[in-house]
Amino acid sequence: VLVRPCMRPDGFSSMLNIWMGSDFDGAFAQYVKVPANEVFPIESSWTNAELGSIPCSYGSAENMVQRSRVTSGEHVLVAGASGGVGSAVVQLAKVRGATVTAIVGKSKMDEVLRIGADFVVDRDSDIVSELGEECFDVVIDNVGGPHFAEELNTLKRGGRFASSGAIGGPLVNLDLRTMYLKDLTLIG
């Protein structure tokens, strides 16, 4: 079975939620006590570890892709595209008909192309020099860190930036003028 990691005791019309693994222990436990309506039977040849990655990775990815309103014909930049959430973002953006450029380490480039990215760029490169300014409709980043400002510069006017992580560092540089002069939307 799979257990919904973000439980909503008051239903989906309420923003009240309880996060398994944050609000209480048990996100990756072998046994956990939860309400029956938060449990979903699964028949699959996947291991428990493989199945256990789906709600977190794909749930986070779908939330960012949906909230940033990715649509067919748009160009999306995905930072951290070789990780669980990032690779899910690549696949979910492609399903919506977007063109996807992925930022990854050199050793992961072929794998990220295999899962659906149209283009890959080395995470150690100068992102703006490599990709150009104002070429993406959406940036989805679950890394944070030193590339944050560069990624904002790659957004077109009216672009959307979604973030769900900071493994590259939680403190970033931001020139506020980039945000308001380009009319960007930041989504957390």
Regions found by a protein language model. Give the residues of each.
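Short amphipathic alpha-helix with an adjacent loop that forms part of the alpha/beta core around
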Residues: 125-134
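Local beta-strand N-terminus motif with an aromatic residue
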Residues: 29, 73, 117, 135-136
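Glycine-rich phosphate/adenylate-binding loop and adjacent beta-alpha elements
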Residues: 1-40
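Conserved "cap/hinge" positions at secondary-structure junctions
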Residues: 3-5, 80, 104, 165
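Mid-domain Rossmann-like dinucleotide-binding core that forms the NAD(H)/NADP(H) cofactor-binding site
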Residues: 46-125
